């Protein structure tokens, strides 16, 4: 499965993974507001042999299947995205 990976210009080290390029329909609008305009980093095959940095491909794949997107945040994040369930 290919996914599109976007980085945040507002939140250093934050990445948003979606199943289809430019399709943010499953991402809550409040999350997108905090994330800022997504900047495409790359298309990535989650079922391929290459690994992602600091995140498990299977976890990303399952989360995209379940909720339509995956949010990767920097470990030193200030807590803005930590309660994603409240944003939905």
From Swiss-Prot:
InterPro entries: YcgL-like_sf (IPR038068), YcgL_dom (IPR027354). SUPFAM superfamilies: YcgL-like. Residues 1-85 form the YcgL domain. This is YcgL domain-containing protein CGSHiGG_01115. It comes from Haemophilus influenzae (strain PittGG).
């Amino acid at each position: 499965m290919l996914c599109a990976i976007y980085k945040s210009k507002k939140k250093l080290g934050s990445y948003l993974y979606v199943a289809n390029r430019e399709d943010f329909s499953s991402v809550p609008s409040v999350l997108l507001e905090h994330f800022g305009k997504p900047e495409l980093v790359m298309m990535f095959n989650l079922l391929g042999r290459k690994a992602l940095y600091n995140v498990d491909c299977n976890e990303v794949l399952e989360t995209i299947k379940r909720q339509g997107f995956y949010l990767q945040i920097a470990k030193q994040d200030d807590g803005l995205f930590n309660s994603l369930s409240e944003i939905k």
